[in-house]
Amino acid sequence: WVLLPASQFLCRGCVSNGSPRARGVARQFADAPVTIVGLHTVFEHHDVMGPEALAVFLQEYRVTFPVAVERPGRSGGTTPQTMRAYRMRGTPTVVLIDAVGRLRQQVFGIYDDLHLGRDLGSLVAEATLSVAAVQGP
């Protein structure tokens, strides 16, 4: 399964909750079948959120999982392409995709630990059961 935390480093909720939570998931689920890919999605203040500033942020906040840089909106639009495709309302947004590629959860704002843990546990259990079913007795 995939955890996709979408954020931008000038977003207070992303810095105080989204990024630390994603780093925590990376630590806690290090042995689980999970891929974590951050998405740096910029829909405002483009002039100060370039690649150099992002690199400094990732180093300063010890982000170890890969972070993709969102493509700008098409035809001069301000909403980035992935943000538009997933109908994200802003940042932070967390997207959970299951082992077969289905969107299972999308949360805008603070994804509290209890609900995130429950949802991640369900996906880990499903993935474990799927592997066991394929391998057989």
Regions found by a protein language model. Give the residues of each.
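Alpha/beta-hydrolase fold active-site loops
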Residues: 1-2, 34, 92
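Aromatic-flanked redox-active Cys/Sec active sites in thiol-based oxidoreductases
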Residues: 4-11, 41
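Conserved Rossmann-like nucleotide-binding pocket used by diverse enzymes
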Residues: 7, 37, 68, 84
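Structural microenvironment flanking redox-active thiols in thiol-disulfide oxidoreductases
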Residues: 13-62, 72-81
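Thiol/disulfide oxidoreductase modules built on the thioredoxin-like
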Residues: 17, 61-63, 70-121
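Non-globular targeting/processing and membrane-anchoring segments
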Residues: 118-137
